[in-house]
Regions:
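His/Asp/Glu-enriched, well-ordered alpha-helical/loop segment
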Residues: 78-88, 92-173
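Histidine/acidic residue-rich metal-binding segments in metalloenzymes
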Residues: 1-82, 94-109
């Protein structure tokens, strides 16, 4: 589709590899510009406290799907939000052996659950958390409603309250 052949693809990959030392400074500039514009930024798959700290220094205050407890604790300890995938909860763990969302939730280190690649998972995750007794229903539902709204700064939604944007879904316990 790009109209290139294997030789030009290889040349492009080699050129990008040769410029890899430019990446940190480019990220610094990009993050500074986005922060100046008020854009919420998140890191993905943080593995270490040090790596999480580098992102935080750039103004990146959301840690999405940290891969280790160390990275999640570093984010939480610095006041950054930790977001995990609802499918991780539904499956009972990470699909690739990384950190379990259930573990972070039980430690109070997860601020929000995201649908990730499977839109039915937030509802299922909240209900599973409540049924398991790990959280009460209100606490479990907050991870898929008010939690995501808060971490994204969406103060006009996330709770059922006068003047706020909201959708309401009625769930039948029997089904």
């Amino acid at each position: 589709k790009a109209g290139r052949g294997p030789e030009s693809d290889l040349a492009q990959a080699q050129e990008m590899h040769a410029r890899r030392d430019e990446v940190p400074a480019a990220l610094d500039r990009l993050c500074a510009e986005l922060a100046q514009r008020g854009v919420k930024m998140g890191s993905h798959d943080d593995q270490t406290a040090e790596g999480r700290g580098l992102w935080r220094a750039r103004g990146v205050t959301l840690a999405e799907f940290p891969e280790t407890q160390e990275a999640a604790e570093a984010a939480h300890g610095a006041g950054d939000a930790v977001i995990m995938g609802a499918p991780n909860v539904v499956r009972g763990g990470s699909h690739n052996g990384n950190l379990s969302a259930l573990d972070l939730i039980s430690m109070g280190l997860c601020h929000a659950l995201a649908s990730d690649y499977h839109y039915p998972s937030p509802r299922r995750a909240a209900l599973m958390l409540a049924q398991s007794g790990l959280l009460d229903l209100a606490g479990a539902w907050a991870l898929v409603s008010s939690g995501p709204a808060q971490v994204l700064g969406l103060t006009d939604r996330g709770t059922l309250a006068p003047g706020k944007r909201a959708d309401i879904v009625l769930l039948d316990k029997a089904t």
